[in-house]
Amino acid sequence: QRRNWVPAFHKLSDFMQNADSIGGRGNGRLRLSNYVKYGIFEEGDIRNSNFNIRRTIYCNKQPKADKATIGINANGYWENDESKVVKKITIGLGDKVYCHEADTLNVMYPHTTKWGAYDPTDDFGYAMVKDIPLMRFAEAYLLRAEARFRQGNSQGAADDINVLRDRAFKDYRQIAPGAGKVSASDISIDFILDERIRELVGEENRRFTLMRTGQLANRVNMMVTKWAEKSENKRISGFDANKHILLPIPLTEIQLNKDAKLEQNPGYEVDDK
């Protein structure tokens, strides 16, 4: 689980080496959506700082002299094709690291730092499967905020969310008093779901939350129509709201249910004939 959330920085071996400061040796199999990266955070929210969602990576390995200078293309990526290079830069220890455009899939991209782990005696990262949070205090406030909203108590919901935001905007409020504070008029189920992202991204099972609140189809549609990735292999496709809201019941469970017929969920039925 931990390695899935951490990009595969080790593939940039000229400039990067495994270390605790970058989350160890990840394999980059889980990504934040465009909505999370660009659509939900306000200025000054520490939950979006580079310490929590890392967007800039710095060289932690002194590159060899013949590897330190690279070409950069018009889009700001490392480019090997000289015809597309618009400038040359030399990277040293502590400088910003650049990657090829193709590497944004799993090597370098904005990511949550919650899952980083590194053991110098296990450089490859075999032991990065560790305890995971099931629930923490912040989620108790978010659940109560949702319950209060459903009871018609939007002010109570705002009060609960503001407890979290008093922490998230504490430093920024020194220059912008009141930053991040919400009122009853701000509260909706969409706002609460967004606040759950801001607070719990990478921790909760998001699909279950969206199923529980009846918002899975709406959120998938929003991702497809407004926040879709440019690359086909990064997009959501094939979602059918008539089928995919629920998951299939395993055939073994249906067969073991002897006293009554256990109906398969719609869309997953198998013809017995």
Task: Write out the residue ranges for each language-model feature.
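Catalytic lumenal/periplasmic loop and adjoining terminal transmembrane helix
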Residues: 167-168, 219
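Elongated scaffold/linker segments in the mid-to-C-terminal portions of large proteins
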Residues: 1-136, 220-273
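Short loop/turn segments at secondary-structure transitions that flank enzyme active sites
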Residues: 54-57, 170, 198, 216
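Extended, hydrophobic/aromatic-rich amphipathic alpha-helical segments that build helical scaffolds
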Residues: 45, 131-167, 189-199, 203, ...
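Short, contiguous acidic/charged loop-to-helix segments that flank catalytic cores in large enzymes
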Residues: 124-134, 147-150, 178-184
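Short, surface-exposed recognition loops and adjoining beta-strand edges that mediate ligand/DNA contacts
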Residues: 1-12, 171-187, 191, 208, ...
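Acidic/serine-rich, low-complexity amphipathic helices located in mid- to C-terminal regulatory regions
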Residues: 1, 185-224
